[in-house]
Structure formats: C-alpha cells, structure tokens
Regions:
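Short, well-structured N-terminal submotif of metal-dependent ribonuclease cores
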Residues: 1-38, 54-66, 108, 117-121
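Acidic catalytic patch
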Residues: 63-91
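Acidic donor-binding loop at a coil-to-helix junction in glycosyltransferase catalytic cores
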Residues: 97
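Acidic, PIN/NYN-like endoribonuclease modules and their adjacent C-terminal/linker elements
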Residues: 100-128
C-alpha cells in the first residue's frame, strides 16, 4: 500500500476540487488503495492563517476535519522524532509549517504530495 503525506495546500485544493491539483496528485488522491496522512501542523497553519485574515474558506475547520475523516486521511501529531529531524534540517525552507511537514515526511518515510518547489530540495520524495 502506498502512503502519502499531504501538504496543506493539497488538502485545501482536494477539499475544493481545485483544478490546480496536478494529474499525478489527483490520481493518487482518487486511488482507494492509497493511505493518506496529514500533519496536525497543516490544521494549525490553516487556523492561524484564518485568524490573521490571510485565508478564507467556505467551510469551517470542523467541516474540514470531518472531511478528512470521511476521506480516511489520518491526522498525525508532531512528536519528538519529528522535532529531532526538524532540528537538523538545513534552512532552505523558511516556512515553519512546511519545515514540520517535511520533517514528518522524512521521519515516517512518506511521499509528500506538494507543489512546493523548495520542498524538493530536501531528501524526501515529493510528488507533483
């Protein structure tokens, strides 16, 4: 079974059925045999951006979490192993949420689904 970690924007684009999703990403997301994961950092990022007025959604955070559950997207905590990897990451990427997501991908050996070009500079598999 293939296992993938979703970047924050991928979750939102999936929720909105956004045409910005690549064909490769869409194929993975539509495959019922894949196992999808999301870092709690993504929900934290969404919450902060909403509270700052930088992100407006047509649905609540609760509805987004319900959608994750309905789509069998497993929400992962930030644990000590993730923090150990995060501490050693070079500062190629300055966004703290993306750094946590990248560290989670590395820790759990999950392919990261993301359009983020900077994420590709780390030693984790990025699919787009």
């Amino acid at each position: 079974m293939n296992k993938y970690l979703l970047d924050t924007h991928v979750l939102l684009w999936m929720q909105d059925d956004n045409i910005a999703l690549s064909k490769a990403a869409r194929k993975i997301l539509e495959d019922s045999t894949t196992q999808l994961y999301l870092s709690i950092a993504s929900l934290w990022e969404i919450t902060i951006k909403q509270s700052l007025g930088k992100l407006q959604l047509q649905y609540s955070l609760e509805e987004l979490i319900d959608s994750c559950n309905a789509n069998k997207i497993n929400i992962l905590p930030i644990d000590f192993e993730t923090l150990k990897i995060l501490k050693t990451l070079p500062f190629i990427h300055r966004d703290p949420f993306d750094r946590i997501i990248i560290a989670t991908s590395m820790e759990l050996d999950l392919d990261l689904i993301s359009s983020d070009e900077i994420a590709k500079k780390y030693s984790t598999s990025v699919i787009w």
